[in-house]
A protein has these predicted regions:
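Aromatic-lined ligand-binding clefts that engage carbohydrates, nucleic acids, or primary amines
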Residues: 122-141, 170
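A domain-start/cap signature at the N-terminus of enzymes
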Residues: 202-203, 239-337, 671
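C-terminal catalytic histidine-bearing segment of alpha/beta-hydrolase fold enzymes
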Residues: 491-493, 497, 501-597
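Solvent-exposed alpha-helical segments and adjacent loops
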Residues: 600, 611-614, 619-851
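Mobile cap/lid helix-loop segments that gate and shape the active-site cleft of serine hydrolases
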Residues: 429-476, 481-482
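Active-site machinery of serine-nucleophile hydrolases
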Residues: 337-397
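Accessory carbohydrate-binding/adhesion or oligomerization-edge regions at the termini
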Residues: 15-16, 20-101, 169-204, 212, ...
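Gly/Ser-rich "nucleophile elbow"/oxyanion-hole loop immediately N-terminal to the catalytic nucleophile
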Residues: 329-336, 380-412, 422-428
Length: 851
């Protein structure tokens, strides 16, 4: 492969505004590349390396004609070939692939694939930092080190890399449908900080309204050394903003952190006659004696317009926003309460755009959460938690009637409506999914994953136990007291009407209140001009009228509650499940008030359940109470404000609680692995050995959390973790006991032990020189928080574990996983052991599979 010699001589003054604005205006773009593909890629499967035949993604140096096996291509072989950029876009230009046949055989998943492009860049200067923007690329390797791409092509994922003198190898991994294209831009920089104004999370300034909120600004450290004693100031020339001064002790080299900056208006703002639609704020960052400035545009609107409201996330203290459309002709009235319509957007849609699709109602606030990003997390996991926080914020900010809260959404947001509505049915008076899909397997099937091809059924059952909570079909029984309106276009080829028809049928057969409106001739996103309101597929008059006529029944006489994962939700109306008999299997509570002194209860896979007094006081009377539990009769005397607790002892239920050990799984301390990232967490990299490897792994995962989840995470060395950090955060550890001081400190107190010779899982020895390990466990130094260990029996295995991200939905990681380097080829087929800790956080045969 010949080197492409490109030279750029740019010199920027570090203290000038022009420098920050101009850094990303004059990129180096490579015209000539080598490309190869396509390789079959299973939906939502990470970590597969399709280039292992020639060294793998990190090491390959291809040439024209070098071949790899791929069953998507004629003859089962693909070869590296030349390709040239066209208008800045690099086509992978696959050869002779019969896409029609693949789609006919496998549906649209037959078009999903991964390809690669390779080039070399000759840097004539000394070591220098550059920013890279790899649009529509999943990731790229710079001299063998992986970095995140801007997979969705949103044009904001600028990541710092180090240019070395001479030849620099570039490998870009691109996923997509049929024949994808990408762009790759290099921006050499000579400043230490890049303020990324392409990815601001900013509130709107509302005329006549004071502002006391937050601004999120990504800052990239484009320096090889850490920056100390950073000062950030925010103000504006007009004086409408209060001057803000913020101090940060240090920023790590070559990192991107989206910082939370307070933003407040002065007293003069509510009285200001500000006619312009933008107020420009000035942001200044001072570090090591240098000043870096950027102008921040703040949109100015009237209160009646859809506008953005920012807040700090409970998960990671990052700045998020929701959009709000106030009621028509709204005026504050202490006596008046409005309905709240929570609206979930579809993939690629901004929350502010979702709010703009509606016409104002005189009876309701419309609030659109973000799912953390336009693509985000399918309204599951962090997306679900985002909605629940926005719900509480909206109820605290606006005059909301809690009995008239509704959930609706379109496409991905329709799935979110099903997912959130069925898991949290007691939060909503009614839900209205539009073009919503049921589950991943029903929508984007996983059958082409390498794990599906190579995985043992017992191992895949562990993964599927984690994933089952995303299947709406499984939880439709929870809609016993939740009216549902389903809207669907009959000709929708994005989310086919089969999803809506299927879920409608399930609800109808249960006898639940459900309306199905399949609109003839309409596709995915549609409008009917003759109908009043906003865009019809989200603001349909019949849908809105259905919502409007319903009020929440917060104390229903009959409750059906099904769950499989208490970390997602353990409470519905007046029923709370505290413990399951068998973890991650379906648990069902059916409880019905027969009369004022009798409750009939059916329990399936429930070890302990509570019935909560707030609702019961409206349903039963104090005094003697008869409980019929799985046909077993119990009696008690009940007083108002008393909880009723039932627990299982020797196959029979009795009043009272189960004994708890020193460590017991509770909904807040339950697993699986992803739960450690649902409450505040920090990354802790090892410095005993391989410090650069661990730090880089922490960097790229922090960058993924930023670009995928609009998130923030602090990265610390193992020697920097204080008792205060241990008390406040879940610790995500990079490196095993050989390379991380903190992992070494905890090793004797953890049920999984790692050495150079192998892994011990409880009492099971698993020998192996290249075993990767990931597991979650209550922190022995603070059992109210988690530790997550990412490690291995070798540097290669540790690297594999550390880089295996779970910042996406459909990941299916349980409490612990032990796997080998064949993960890069076989995915879940590489698992040596996987499973869940038992109720007492111990290794138990019934909850794990060891190969």
């Amino acid at each position: 492969m010949r080197s492409f010699v490109l030279t750029l001589l740019l010199c920027f003054a570090a203290s000038s505004l022009w420098a920050q604005a101009e850094i990303v205006k004059h990129p180096i773009q490579i015209s000539d590349w080598l490309a190869v593909g396509p390789f079959s890629s299973g939906s939502r499967e990470r970590g597969i390396d399709f280039l292992l035949e020639h060294g793998g993604e990190a090491k390959i140096q291809p040439c024209v004609g070098m071949q790899h096996h791929s069953f998507l291509a004629p003859g089962g072989v693909v070869r590296w070939h030349k390709t040239t950029a066209i208008d800045g876009k690099i086509p992978l230009a696959y050869k002779n692939v019969n896409w029609e046949a693949l789609q006919e055989a496998w549906g649209w998943m037959g078009l999903a694939n991964v390809g690669y492009a390779y080039a070399e860049y000759q840097h004539l200067g000394t070591r220098q930092v550059a920013l890279i923007l790899a649009d529509k690329a999943g990731c790229f390797y710079w001299n063998g080190c992986p970095f995140p791409g801007d997979v969705y092509g949103r044009h904001y994922v600028y990541v710092p890399v180090m240019l070395k003198p001479g030849n620099n190898r570039i490998l870009v991994r691109v996923g997509g449908w049929k024949e994808p294209k990408f762009s790759f831009k290099i921006f050499p920089v000579s400043v230490a900080i890049f303020i990324n104004t392409f990815d601001l999370t900013a509130p709107d300034l509302v005329r006549r309204q004071p502002l006391d909120s937050w601004l999120g600004v990504p800052v990239a450290v484009t320096s090889e050394r850490p920056l100390q004693n950073i000062t950030i100031t925010l103000d504006d020339k007009s004086g409408y903003l209060q001057p803000i001064r913020l101090s940060i002790k240090n920023l790590l080299p070559l990192t991107v952190q989206k910082l939370a900056i307070p933003i407040r208006t002065n007293r003069s703002w509510p009285e200001a006659d500000f006619a312009a639609d933008t107020l420009w704020a000035n942001l200044k960052v001072e570090a090591d004696g240098q000043k870096y400035t950027a102008r921040i545009p703040l949109r100015v609107v009237n209160f009646q317009q859809p506008h953005r409201v920012t807040y700090l996330s409970d998960i990671d203290s990052s700045v998020q926003y929701f959009a709000v459309l106030p009621p028509k002709n709204f005026a504050y009235d202490q006596e008046k309460r409005y309905a709240l319509i929570l609206s979930a957007h579809g993939a690629s849609v901004e929350a502010i755009g979702q709010a703009m699709a509606y016409e104002p109602k005189d009876w309701a606030f419309i609030v659109a959460a973000t799912n953390r990003r336009p693509y985000g997390f399918d309204w599951q996991d962090w997306g679900r938690l985002d909605v629940l926080q926005v719900l509480q914020l909206a109820k605290s900010i606006y005059p909301i009637d809690s009995d008239r809260v509704y959930l609706t959404g379109h496409s991905m947001g329709g799935h979110g409506t099903w997912h959130i509505g069925l898991h949290h049915a007691d939060q909503f008076a009614a839900i209205a999914p539009s073009a919503g899909w049921d589950s991943f397997q029903f929508y984007v099937p996983l059958f082409l994953q390498k794990g599906e091809i190579f995985g043992q059924p017992q191992m895949l059952a562990i993964r599927d136990a984690v994933l089952q909570e995303e299947r709406a079909s499984v939880f439709v029984e929870n809609a016993q007291n939740l009216p549902v309106y389903i809207l669907q276009g009959s000709e929708d080829d994005e989310v086919p009407p089969t999803h809506a028809r299927h879920l409608f049928g399930l609800l109808k057969r249960l006898g639940y209140e459900v309306v199905y409106n399949e609109v003839p001739g309409k596709g995915h996103w549609w409008n009917v001009d003759s109908l009043p309101g906003g865009t019809s597929c989200v603001d349909h008059p019949a849908l809105m009228e259905f919502l409007r006529k319903h009020k929440l029944n917060s104390a229903p006489r009959r409750v059906v509650f099904k769950t499989t994962d208490l970390s997602v939700n353990n409470r519905l109306y007046w029923v709370q499940i505290d413990r399951l008999q068998k973890l991650y299997q379906e648990a069902v509570v059916t409880a019905e008030i027969n009369n004022e002194h009798e409750i009939e209860i059916s329990l399936q896979n429930v070890a302990q359940v509570q019935f909560l007094p707030e609702a019961l006081t409206r349903l039963i009377q104090p005094g003697k109470l008869r409980l019929i539990v799985n046909k077993q009769v119990l009696t008690t005397r009940w007083q108002r404000e008393n909880r009723i607790v039932l627990s299982l002892h020797n196959d029979r239920y009795r009043l009272g609680t189960l004994k708890q050990g020193k460590l017991t799984k509770t909904p807040a301390l339950y697993g699986p692995l992803r739960q450690a990232y649902f409450t505040p967490f920090v990354f802790v990299y090892g410095t005993k050995e391989d410090a650069n490897q661990h730090l880089h792994a922490a960097r790229i995962l922090a960058e993924e959390w930023w670009w995928r989840g609009n998130g923030f995470v602090t990265i610390l060395a193992d020697t920097q973790v204080t008792s205060e950090i241990i008390q406040k955060y879940n610790l995500i550890l990079f490196g095993g006991p050989r390379s991380n001081f903190l992992t070494q400190r905890l090793q004797d107190y953890l049920p999984i032990k790692i050495s150079n010779e192998g892994v011990t899982l409880g009492s099971f020895p698993i020998p192996g020189s290249d075993l990767a390990v990931k597991f979650i466990y209550p922190n022995p130094l603070n059992p109210n928080k988690f530790v997550v260990v990412n490690a291995g029996t070798s540097p290669l295995a540790s690297c594999l574990s550390e880089r295996l991200s779970l910042f996406y939905t459909g990941v299916g990681f349980p409490d612990f996983m032990i796997f080998d380097l064949s993960f890069k080829e076989k995915g879940w087929g590489s698992m040596i052991a996987a499973g869940f800790f038992d109720q007492n956080w111990q290794v138990a045969k019934e909850y794990c599979v060891v190969r």
